Amino acid sequence: MKRTMQILVGMVGLLNFLIGLGFLFNPSKMATEFALSPLGTQGMATMRADFPAFFLTGAIFSLIGAWRADRTPLMVPLMLLTFALLGRFVSIALDGAAPTTVPPMIIEAAMIGLLGLAYRSFGKQAN
């Protein structure tokens, strides 16, 4: 079970790493995929700074946790994804829901669930 969780958490880390690199090096394409509209140079700079910070931080700590089978680093992506999902619920409450609202929520919830299972699977001690 632990080895399976290491692989799955590694895949979560890799996915987030690729998304982070996408925002860093091709923010225009990522803006389209994430339904974003950056305003001018500052908007592009924000996409190159804030989004990679979120995704790459989550990715790196997921990969560290997976590599070491250590649950402590998993707290970082768990917190990031939990706050992202919370933000989506706040957005639904304040702005309403669009047909595109649910799929990213499902992905985030699945990653939270997977990371939570890995957190339990990896136990208190690193290998």
Predicted regions and their residues:
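N-terminal signal-anchor transmembrane alpha helix
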Residues: 7-23
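Aromatic-anchored segments of alpha-helical transmembrane domains
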Residues: 16-19, 80-90
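Interfacial loop at the N-terminal end of multi-pass membrane proteins
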Residues: 27-47
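Core segments of alpha-helical transmembrane spans in multipass integral membrane proteins
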Residues: 43-64, 79, 83
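Membrane-helix boundary connector in multi-pass membrane proteins
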Residues: 67, 86-102
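Membrane-interfacial loop-to-transmembrane alpha-helix junctions, especially the N-terminal start
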Residues: 70-80
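Small-residue-rich transmembrane alpha-helices that serve as helix-helix interface/gating elements
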Residues: 102-114
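Membrane-water interface at the C-terminal end of transmembrane alpha helices
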Residues: 111-127
